[in-house]
């Protein structure tokens, strides 16, 4: 028991566990692992959507430069199937450890609530892509955007847009506990605010934490200087 409990960052004491055992199925216990997430430098395969090389909607020159660079590094990139846009990070499962992937519900408002009906048509159904890939995933019913999950050591950094995407008030502690329970790691929430018209193409309506933070190892992170554009929010 001590060995199992030692795998978690926090847990009720043994007495509380025994007392609550009879109603265990009806309770949500938040056991959060303290081991590190799998980071980019520890992975060994790169998958790209073929949309990235599409001459009309993609960026074929960038695709060629990127794949050449990967091959020069001894990495043979692989292509995904059944994708509808090239932002694979946003809709593909998040890799939590060597053999653990989590598939989430990808229904971003910037696609599903856009006034342009073509935007919703670009939503990729992850289940279709996963067929034949040989990847075993567990699933969550929570609505998450892959671009809004940045692994930082044992933590996952997300903007507070994840609350509104799931119909919750920002700061809802019960929802945050559920989110951490599904991810199996503690979540750090950073604030985000949309500026401009939702339907304008140049408006940042995405709320992605990967545009704010990058883990550099240890206790170091690289952050964009948000105060350059919105000094009133950087106080």
Regions found by a protein language model. Give the residues of each.
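The feature marks the mature, well-folded catalytic cores of soluble enzymes
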Residues: 1-235
């Amino acid at each position: 028991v001590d060995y199992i409990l030692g795998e978690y960052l926090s847990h009720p004491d043994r007495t509380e566990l025994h007392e609550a055992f009879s109603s265990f199925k009806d309770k949500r216990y938040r056991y959060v692992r303290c081991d590190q997430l799998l980071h980019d430098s520890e992975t060994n395969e790169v998958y790209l959507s073929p949309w990235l090389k599409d001459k009309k909607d993609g960026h074929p020159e960038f695709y060629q430069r990127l794949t050449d660079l990967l091959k020069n590094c001894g990495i043979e990139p692989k292509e995904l199937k059944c994708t509808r846009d090239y932002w694979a990070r946003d809709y593909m499962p998040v890799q939590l450890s060597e053999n653990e992937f989590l598939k989430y519900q990808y229904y971003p408002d910037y696609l599903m609530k856009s006034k342009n009906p073509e935007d919703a048509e670009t939503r990729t159904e992850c289940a279709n892509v996963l067929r034949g890939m040989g990847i075993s995933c567990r699933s969550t019913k929570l609505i998450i955007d892959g671009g809004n999950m940045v692994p930082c050591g044992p933590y996952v950094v997300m903007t507070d847009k994840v609350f509104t995407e799931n119909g919750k008030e920002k700061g809802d502690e019960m929802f945050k506990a559920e989110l951490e329970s599904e991810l199996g790691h503690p979540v750090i929430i950073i604030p985000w605010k949309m500026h401009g018209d939702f339907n304008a193409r140049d408006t940042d309506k995405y709320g992605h934490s990967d545009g704010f933070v990058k883990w550099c190892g240890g206790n170091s992170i690289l952050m964009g200087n948000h105060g350059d554009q919105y000094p009133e929010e950087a106080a």
